[in-house]
Amino acid sequence: MNDSQRVSILSEALPYIQSFSGRKIVIKYGGSVMENDNLKNAFFRDIALLSTVGVCPIVIHGGGPEINNWLKKLEISPKFENGLRITDQKTMEIVEMVLMGRVNKQIVKGINKTGSLAVGISGLDGNLIQSRELGDGSHGLVGEVTKINPEILDPLISKGYIPIISSIGSTLEGISHNINADFVAGEIAAAINAEKLILLTDTQGILKEKDNKNSLVEKTNLKEARDFIDKKIVTEGMIPKTECCIRALAQGVKAAHIIDGRIEHSLLLEIFTNSGIGTMIVA
């Protein structure tokens, strides 16, 4: 890339930087980007850049692969049903240890190394994420969000800190739950009136034809997104991600994006370029 191209890119980004300065963007960090050092470092720099130009990023993370690694080290076999982790009390203790004590702090350290200031918390802090058992409780301590109490985030964001939130919630009685990070991100985005919800995934976005990379849906709306699910254009793991976006938009989030986290700087490409890189869903 020559100097002219660099200047052109900066020029293209300027109106987006101006538009989103001071706005909150909730980003779900997960998938391959968490396991590849180059992708991780690019993500940390992207978050730092967003913060530097005045955007207010809030990062929600899971950590499935890291949880599985620690379960295996402790000779516990991970168990799943319909894509959900079966979470007994012993597994829940490991989930909390890994997400809150290891994955969360690795993200904080990575962002802080760029010169920005991140603060790691979980849904337990300030009762940020209240939860209950999912469905009939057959998955154990897998939970769903009942309420978001975002007040703890306000002083962090107002002072320029970047909140990094692990997707653990609890009941008012103190029972912890492991919650799907996509849905946590969507509920937090709605609760804080975020400008955008962005899900980093291991797919390009919504494809009209499952195995056709050229069939990417670059922009769609709530009605079409629901139709994609009903007509089984969106299937398998993309269903909960799309549903999460639909729910967030229905609660007032202005735009939701499903993007390919396997591409370096995909976050900046989606936010600061005309063409974007994934699927944007609007109300």
Curated annotation (Swiss-Prot):
Going by the record, the broad EC class of this enzyme is: transferase
Query: Where does it live in the cell?
Result: Cytoplasm
- What's the catalysed reaction? N-acetyl-L-glutamate + ATP = N-acetyl-L-glutamyl 5-phosphate + ADP
GO BP of this protein: arginine biosynthetic process via ornithine; L-arginine biosynthetic process
Tell me which UniProt keywords the record has, alphabetically. Answer: Amino-acid biosynthesis, Arginine biosynthesis, ATP-binding, Cytoplasm, Kinase, Nucleotide-binding, Transferase
Cellular component GO terms, alphabetically? cytoplasm
Which family does the UniProt entry place this protein in? Belongs to the acetylglutamate kinase family. ArgB subfamily.
Q: Any idea what this protein is called?
A: Acetylglutamate kinase
Native organism is: Prochlorococcus marinus (strain MIT 9215)
